[in-house]
Amino acid sequence: MVMGLHLLLLVFILGLGLTPPTLAQNDIRYIKFLDQHYDPKTKNGNDKYCEKMMRLRNMISPCKEINTFIHGNKASIKAICGNQNGEPHNGNQRISKSAFQVTICRHIGGSPRPPCRYRATAGFRNLVVACENDLPVHLDESIFRP
């Protein structure tokens, strides 16, 4: 029993040593990207939506100047980092081939401390993202593309 436990522990430790740390870091950056920008449930955000989401996502201490929420599915967003839904843009960035429904929340002045007030702009935009290991890790901008 003890020998089997030691063998299991050894296999686990070896597995940790063989996992590249960059994979775990990229997963964390991708999760942070989703936390800041992904909201599949809402289709059209308004000012109250922005104030609520910015508070729920902890982006109000200090008040974040601007944030874009993407209302699409994860597979389509991830596909920007590949050829299915993305193409090279400005060096190491990628731009989506298709437009996504988004809500852009802009801080409307006043104090950088809560309570934060936001103005919502909803629409369809192409996304410009930075990718690492085929995962989006930074939303650079959302643009109208002819």
UniProtKB/Swiss-Prot annotation:
TRNA binds at C105. This is Angiogenin. Belongs to the pancreatic ribonuclease family. Its EC number is 3.1.27.-. It is found in: Secreted; Nucleus; Nucleus, Nucleolus; Cytoplasm, Stress granule. Secreted ribonuclease that can either promote or restrict cell proliferation of target cells, depending on the context. Endocytosed in target cells via its receptor PLXNB2 and translocates to the cytoplasm or nucleus. Under stress conditions, localizes to the cytoplasm and promotes the assembly of stress granules (SGs): specifically cleaves a subset of tRNAs within anticodon loops to produce tRNA-derived stress-induced fragments (tiRNAs), resulting in translation repression and inhibition of cell proliferation. tiRNas also prevent formation of apoptosome, thereby promoting cell survival. It comes from the Eukaryota. The modification Pyrrolidone carboxylic acid is found at Q25. The keyword Signal applies. The keyword Disulfide bond applies. One of its GO terms (molecular function) is tRNA-specific ribonuclease activity. Has weak tRNA ribonuclease activity by itself due to partial autoinhibition by its C-terminus, which folds into a short alpha-helix that partially occludes the substrate-binding site. In absence of stress, the ribonuclease activity is inhibited by RNH1 in the cytoplasm. In response to stress, dissociates from RNH1 in the cytoplasm and associates with cytoplasmic ribosomes with vacant A-sites: ribosomes directly activate the tRNA ribonuclease activity of ANG by refolding the C-terminal alpha-helix. In response to stress, the angiogenic activity of ANG is inhibited by RNH1 in the nucleus. CDD domains: RNase_A_canonical (cd06265). The lineage of its organism: Eukaryota, Metazoa, Chordata, Craniata, Vertebrata. SMART domains: RNAse_Pc.
